[in-house]
């Protein structure tokens, strides 16, 4: 199981980076796309959604950075790697879903990068151990 720790951290870092990229794509989009004569980013709901995403990404980055530091020092547990993999891949799914929503119907078309990001996000919750397996490992680590 310990040999899977690096794999799960690689997945966590990749998922978080992909979520951050989706956020940046969407931030640019909501600043440029207009509706009713205003950038869609100027609407309260868009600002709230972007603020929520930015906050969750910041928290995720802090956790992943902490896990990386522990891994480099040989202190990262199987459970912590599972937490990082589970949390970041679920976060990626949530972020890409919200970002696609902010793109509206355009986000679902192949002409926009967010569409591909949304599709690609799904597999991260499967490879390297499913979300359910990560939760199982965390539960076992608590002695349950």
Predicted regions, residues:
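Alpha-helical interface subdomain recognition
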Residues: 2-144
């Amino acid at each position: 199981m310990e040999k899977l720790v690096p794999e799960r951290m690689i997945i966590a870092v990749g998922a978080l980076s992909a979520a951050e990229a989706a956020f940046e794509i969407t931030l640019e989009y909501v600043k440029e796309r207009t509706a009713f004569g205003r950038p869609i980013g100027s609407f309260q709901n868009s600002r709230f959604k972007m603020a929520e995403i930015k906050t969750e990404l910041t928290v995720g980055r802090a956790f992943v950075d902490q896990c990386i530091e522990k891994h480099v020092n040989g202190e990262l547990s199987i459970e912590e790697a599972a937490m990082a993999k589970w949390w970041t891949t679920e976060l990626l799914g949530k972020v890409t879903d919200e970002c696609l929503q902010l793109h509206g119907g355009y986000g679902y078309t192949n002409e926009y990068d967010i569409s591909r990001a949304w599709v690609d996000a799904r597999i991260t919750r499967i490879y390297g151990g499913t979300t359910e397996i990560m939760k199982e490992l965390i539960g076992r680590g608590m002695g349950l």
